[in-house]
Amino acid sequence: MTIQKINRVLLSVYDKTGLITLAQELKDMGVELVSTGGTLRHLQTHGIPVYSVEEVTGFPEILSGRVKTLHPKIHGGILAKNRENEELSSLDIKTFDLVIVNLYPFEQVMQKAEATEEEVMENIDIGGPTMIRAAAKNWYRVGVCVDPTDYEVLTQQLKQYHGLTDEFRKTLARKAFKHTAQYDKAIFNYFESVDTNKDDETELKFPEFNLLESRELPYGENPHQKASLLMESQKFIQHQGKGLSYNNFQDIDAAIKLVHEFQKPAVVAVKHTNPCGVGVSNTIEEAYDKAYQGDPVSIFGGIVACNRPVTEELASKLTEIFLDVIIAPEFEPRALEKLKSKSGTKVVEMDLEKMVGNKVEIKSTTFGYLCQEADYHHPHPQNWDRVAGEQAKPEEIDDLIIAEKIVKHVKSNAIVVVKEGQSLGIGAGQMNRVGASRIALENAGKESQNSVLASDAFFPFNDVVKLCSQYGVSAIVQPGGSKRDQDSIDLAQETGITMYFTGIRHFKH
């Protein structure tokens, strides 16, 4: 283990969390501090002895502070391989042993709706990333710290060794390069979003990520599997309950993508990423009643997502059974008080508009990463082809639209039965279509009379239509495209069932 002693430190930070405590420790150890700009003033205000960069360089800040640290006496002191160097001595350059820098808040400023282009440009840090990269490149002699959460370990090492171990310096260098890479990626994303001269890109490209946070999860789908969540930033507020699990995140993702499909108040219940109950109505309370009654057995212990704020009245209903997670764009204060009685339930608030928007889906396989456009196709009844039966009534069309929206989010082979804005039966993940239909219709039972049915893919045989006639289904929507389509069309016509072809398949694996 190699220890590099710390005698001289350069500090320049935007985020001043923990700075004074750290600087005080450095001062007490007799370390020389050099700083600039707001960091310098902050340290001086707290009575900590510090040299200014101007005193070191003999050159003032210029261009309203745009150029402060870009000077050989700063970067020579960071990049020098050895402390004793004739070239440095001849130029009166002293080395730095530790660089503590974090950057202008470019991404936060960029995301402000009111931010001007000039304000965004001024928050592109130049000197900071240059110092960070220089120190990280020279990690075998120089420490670099970009994250205030590392100050505690940094202080511990300084107290123990009056320096930093090579292992710790290398870890800090890795974090530093990650920090500057993410920073540059955020800047690229900004220019990408405002560039009006880009060529039209029809080719689907693997998305580029700016993953700022890594959250360790208790385990994966099962307790023997390790897991973590990588995300750009946390976009939700958890009001109560234990931390969200790997399975929770998958189920929440499935639930919010479906509930976001509806303009009217809607509630979606999900189990193992499949919807088990969906309700659409004029009020969020009525929508929940429909979702619950659609499958009162499966909803127990599930995930419930709402596309409207949770009211006190709805909260009272939600506390009648055990739910693992409740998601909504907002919770009324009294609703949160009601939900506290279910301490085991995780209550999560999120902006659905911001959460649902990924245009690309990615799956890891043994061959590599599969990348595809997300299925955001919305039903357009005016484009459907009526191939059997009479024109559906307006209320049947409404239900067909709801069923078509739901079936897109169900694992294939998928069948959904709907009546009056309520899912009555959902057949998910079956190896044959008639099996999925039988599950959905049996769950619907007697309520299937005058219901509608949606399928995520065509009927290879007319057996699904035969089942529909036995259960009293009045209308069917499916993609069509089977070699035996005519068999299904003929049976639908014969049994008085209206059937539409959409030409759009919705497989989900």
Curated annotation (Swiss-Prot):
One Gene Ontology CC term in the entry: cytosol
Protein name (record): Bifunctional purine biosynthesis protein PurH
Domain of life, per lineage: Bacteria
Family, per entry: Belongs to the PurH family.
Pathway per the UniProt entry: Purine metabolism; IMP biosynthesis via de novo pathway; 5-formamido-1-(5-phospho-D-ribosyl)imidazole-4-carboxamide from 5-amino-1-(5-phospho-D-ribosyl)imidazole-4-carboxamide (10-formyl THF route): step 1/1; Purine metabolism; IMP biosynthesis via de novo pathway; IMP from 5-formamido-1-(5-phospho-D-ribosyl)imidazole-4-carboxamide: step 1/1
Enzyme Commission no: 2.1.2.3, 3.5.4.10
Cross-referenced SUPFAM superfamilies: Cytidine deaminase-like (SSF53927), Methylglyoxal synthase-like (SSF52335)
Reaction catalysis annotation: (6R)-10-formyltetrahydrofolate + 5-amino-1-(5-phospho-beta-D-ribosyl)imidazole-4-carboxamide = 5-formamido-1-(5-phospho-D-ribosyl)imidazole-4-carboxamide + (6S)-5,6,7,8-tetrahydrofolate; IMP + H2O = 5-formamido-1-(5-phospho-D-ribosyl)imidazole-4-carboxamide
CDD domains, per the entry: IMPCH
Coiled-coil residues: none
InterPro entries to which the protein is assigned, alphabetical: AICAR_Tfase_dup_dom_sf, Cytidine_deaminase-like, MGS-like_dom, MGS-like_dom_sf, PurH-like
Keywords: Hydrolase, Multifunctional enzyme, Purine biosynthesis, Transferase
A GO biological-process term: 'de novo' IMP biosynthetic process
GO molecular function terms noted in the UniProt entry: IMP cyclohydrolase activity; phosphoribosylaminoimidazolecarboxamide formyltransferase activity
Domain remark from Swiss-Prot or TrEMBL: The IMP cyclohydrolase activity resides in the N-terminal region.
